[in-house]
Amino acid sequence: LQHIMDTSKEMHEWGNNHKQIIDMSDELLRKAKVQGFSDFQIARAIGYEGDMEDGILYVRNHRKQVGILPVVKQIDTLAAEYPAQTNYLYLTYSGVANDVKYLGDHKSIVVLGSGAYRIGSSVEFDWCGVQALQTIRKEGYRSVMINYNPETVSTDYDMCDRLYFDELTFERVMDILELENPHGVIVSTGGQIPNNL
């Protein structure tokens, strides 16, 4: 935790002395991403002035220009006892290569899940997501789900071709969409969170 606090302080100090993110060292930006800082948190830490949605894009565009991109890793469901080949995936900045190959053939469709259950959002949205995944497969496309709720049917290993067990935020969803290069994205089956994106 001390390293994270030190990085936050370093970004705040940097932001007090500079105005443009292009002046920030790639090393500091990479360290912040490896430690889990979102583009929003980085924009806020450096004192970005203006609309925060613009701030997120400001950091994102610079990060992509300098090659600071997440990689996709498979979740090891076998505790390293055997090599695991799963369709359970997550994104991280602590890696150098993707564990899966991307075809870029526009033959996949991404469904955004509902995330955690809460008042007004429960299994009915998961049912909608599962129905969408099944229909996508019937139509001959690869089905891709982004959801972080382990209690849902849509996160079962056999429900989709790829499951990104990751947060439903603009930054993370865009990272996945840029990798998948899908034919389409379905946001309407997950409730308010994906609709707000």
Residue spans of the language-model regions?
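ATP-dependent carboxylate/acyl-activation modules
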Residues: L1-L197
